[in-house]
Regions:
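Active-site-proximal segment of zinc-dependent metalloprotease catalytic domains
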Residues: 1-241
Length: 242
């Protein structure tokens, strides 16, 4: 697949899938932090905590469009993504400060990039969130039970407004998975790897970034030499299907 200009599926990802056999349900607790830019306030009335609780963790029939249901269905009932939503918290800097004309993904621009935004989000949430509840990747699936790795497993930083990929405006943040410059100690664990999406992002974007949390690679064409897997994969253009 690398010859086609798309990522190679990591061997460890395949091993992890093999280890999930037997039909046992893995419950992964995710943390969603809602943050707004001072120059771009969120539409908290329409996109408050209840909206994102429903979008991310809503239950109901499997044909109900939620991130939890998507992964429960596609894992044949073996992965249940659950969690909590906090915010909106107001960031100390503007959207353009963090985007810095590059969608926020300039790796030499810290703190003027999305890493700085994620770090600020963690600090804003620190007084209100017990981050240790979201380190639950050990064999027993119980947070802080002694068999976890000491890192928050799934951290979503949802910012107000739209995104670079949806508008073509590099003054907005691009949705992605990344990590902070250094692990952030909080409640006895570390916040480090995060994903970020926009307030207006569709479910497909959240599911795509959750795929990265689980170890899935991008399968779209990253160097424009092929079509990649196009609409046939969530990790390619399928993430744009809504």
């Amino acid at each position: 697949m690398s010859a086609a200009g798309i990522d190679v599926l990591p061997k460890q990802c395949l091993l992890n899938w093999a280890d999930r056999g037997g039909g046992a349900v893995t419950r992964l607790r995710a943390l969603v932090l809602l943050v707004q830019f001072p120059d771009l306030p969120a539409d908290a009335a329409d996109h408050g905590v209840p909206y994102f609780e429903s979008l991310m963790f809503g239950k109901g029939p499997l044909d109900t469009r939620t991130l939890r249901n998507f992964y429960l269905d596609n894992s044949y009932g073996t992965l249940s993504v659950e969690g909590d939503v906090y915010g909106w918290y107001t960031l100390p800097n503007s959207s353009s400060f963090y985007a810095k004309g590059s969608g926020g993904v300039c790796d030499t621009c810290y703190p003027r990039n999305a890493q700085g935004m994620a770090e600020d989000a963690v600090e804003l949430a620190r007084p209100f969130v017990d981050f240790s509840r979201y380190d639950n990747d050990g064999p027993d699936g119980v947070p802080s039970s002694g068999d976890d790795d000491g890192y928050v497993d799934a951290l979503f930083v949802v910012h107000s407004g739209s995104t670079y990929e949806d508008t073509g405006n590099p003054g907005l943040i691009m949705s992605h998975q990344w990590n902070t410059v250094a692990p952030i100690p909080v409640n006895g664990v570390y916040a480090f790897v995060y994903t970020t999406e926009g307030e207006s992002s569709k479910l497909g974007t959240f599911c795509h970034e959750m795929g990265h949390v689980l170890g899935l690679p991008d399968l779209y064409d990253r160097d424009y030499t092929s079509y990649g897997l196009d609409l046939w994969s969530l990790m390619a253009a399928g993430g744009w299907l809504g």
